[in-house]
Design a protein with these regions (language model features):
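Membrane-embedded alpha-helical signal segments
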Residues: 11-384
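Small-residue-enriched core segments of transmembrane alpha-helices in multipass membrane transport
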Residues: 1-9
């Protein structure tokens, strides 16, 4: 499992190793307080940057274009890639130095909330052991920040030795950029607001003006549409097919559904976007299912609990999480991605429980599986 995970991590590091043209690099706070030390300005306590990265002083050269700093271009490439996959333009990333951090430390914020931090070494490379790595390389042993795998920071002159011994070697800017990519995808729902949605609508109106005018705001107010898109993004559903979303909202609007129920009703219409995340068109979808007895029991529990959602006995919850996690890891060890497929009656509630323990598992209703895709059931989970 570890070896296959290393291959997956390496591929992702390589996929994120993109070049761009610009990033939103704003000023340094190094000189703060040199004059008027007793004064506090509003800018000292307010920062409206949606995404920001603070760097320790040892990492500043990585964003200095005059020194050939590679990080700015990497981050721009990541923004482009994530924007394309999510379906909206991810905000600019503000990069600033922060003297309160250790020299090689970085910190990633969404708004004012710290969502990630770690340490990278600008004069070293991160070596991740691959499938055939047997020889231990000397260096600084760490866990890589994105995948949590064992890794080693090595000197540049050790790169050839590491690669010859089955390690995947990653540049420090790619380590940070890949970590950022994971965070942007994970927190995508926090990155889209009403202004962003209006931009999407204005763009769609150029090709489908009647559709936009008939749905927003006549049938669905802008703030409701924004909440619906956030709900979809929160479960890794791209919002790139806004035309499809609006067309189906036009039909659903007469049912007076809640935001959550509306998003749930939209999901089957976006099944292609969901499934393409886990399996190419020419490969079967690796599916984990629940036994009929277990699924019927969960459906009954959801109906009995009503608005409280699905409340599981602690022992049962632990047993199900363990079984699903082990089945997922078995598929991952083969270099593939598994999805859990359940009844639509319990999908949302069960996904909410699992998300707290198995973050990267996609939970689909069987109504969300495209008819033209091959299915391979890899495990069936029971309550016994």
């Amino acid at each position: 499992i570890v070896a296959a995970g290393a291959g997956f991590a390496a591929k992702n590091f390589e996929d994120k190793n993109l070049q761009g043209s610009q990033a939103n690099l704003e000023g340094s706070d190094v000189s703060e307080g040199e004059e008027n030390k007793d004064e506090v300005d509003l800018s000292d306590v307010t920062d409206y940057a949606p995404i920001s990265i603070q760097l320790g002083y040892g990492l500043v050269e990585m964003v200095d274009n005059n020194s050939g700093g590679p990080l700015v271009n990497r981050i721009t490439g990541i923004r482009k890639q994530v924007s394309k996959s999510l379906g909206f333009v991810v905000p600019n990333v503000r990069i600033r130095d922060d003297l309160s951090l250790e020299a090689n430390q970085y910190r990633i914020r969404i708004g004012q909330t710290i969502v990630g931090e770690d340490e990278i070494f600008p004069d070293k490379k991160l070596a991740i052991p691959g499938d055939e790595a047997t020889t231990k390389i000397q260096g600084i042993e760490v866990k890589d920040p994105t995948f949590g795998m064992d890794a080693i920071w090595i000197s540049n002159f050790q790169q050839n030795e590491a690669e010859a011994n089955g390690y995947v070697v990653v540049a420090p800017e790619s380590v940070l950029a890949t970590h950022l990519s994971q965070i942007l995808s994970k927190h995508s729902a926090q990155l889209i607001g009403q202004d962003d949605v209006q931009i999407l609508l204005d763009n769609l109106a150029q090709s489908a003006p009647s559709l936009v005018q008939s749905v927003v705001p006549k049938l669905v107010p802008l703030h409701n549409l924004t909440s619906i898109l956030r709900t979809l993004l929160n479960e890794r559903v791209p919002v790139s097919d806004l035309r499809c979303i609006l067309e189906n909202l036009a039909v659903l609007s007469s049912q007076n559904l809640s935001v959550t129920d509306t998003a749930e009703a939209l999901r089957p219409h976006l099944s292609g976007l969901l499934v393409q995340q886990v399996a190419p068109l020419n490969q079967p979808i690796q599916v984990i299912t629940l036994s009929g007895e277990l699924e019927n029991m969960l459906i009954k529990m959801v109906r009995q609990s009503g608005d409280e959602g699905l409340i599981l006995d602690a022992n049962l919850a632990q047993q199900l999480i363990k079984g699903i996690s082990e089945a997922q890891q078995k598929v991952t060890s083969d270099g593939k991605t598994a999805v859990l497929v359940v009844s639509p009656a319990i999908r949302r509630q069960f996904a909410s429980i699992l998300k707290q323990h198995i973050e990267d598992l996609l939970v689909l209703a069987f109504t969300e599986l495209p008819d033209n895709r091959q299915i391979n059931v890899v495990a069936t989970i029971s309550s016994e």
